[in-house]
Amino acid sequence: MLLLAGCAGAPMPDPLGPQRRQQIREAILDAHWAPIVADYPDALRPTVHSMKPVSDHDQPAAVLACLRSTGIAASPTDNGFRYNSSLGQSQLEFEAVRYVCSASSPSESEVESYLSGSSRAALFDYQATIVRPCLLAAGAMSPAPPDGGPAYYLSAALAAWSPFMQILASKPRVGTVAYLEKRCPPLPAWLELAGPGVHEVGTH
């Protein structure tokens, strides 16, 4: 009998640490809430119970699914989302739900903008030595990472590389990317910014 296993590696050290993780989490929450409170100064900030970064490719779909799960009839646009107000939600109610949904699933690029050089190096190492070999073992295409040493960790060349970039460019069949992401998670577990039982109550 042939058993197929995923490409899970050994537990990795935590490049962030709890204090820096909380700082990044709070910065992302503040960034997502700022445009809302600017328009609605008296708005009460909702609670965001979890924060799990997703790839840039998956982020719009993750937010859209979250919006729809709350009963909001949302649809994507070129620069975000719109909603059908026929169900009775006000614009503020929609913005509050969108805040929770978008802050719960920040994009990889957004989170990476808060990482130090050593944390970016750890993310690069995970994608280059775990994700890419896993994709190749699954029979998928994956480009070699830029080879420039530590200087690349903060460069545009590194930001432009992803082990999934060839897969996405090939316009794969429906379900292919989801299967490969489940088998070869594009982001490491240590990048999750809040685990079960961690709650953030907004007050501003």
Where are these regions (language model features)?
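C-terminal motif of bacterial Sec signal peptides marking the signal peptidase cleavage site
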Residues: 3-6
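Mitochondrial intermembrane space
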Residues: 8-204
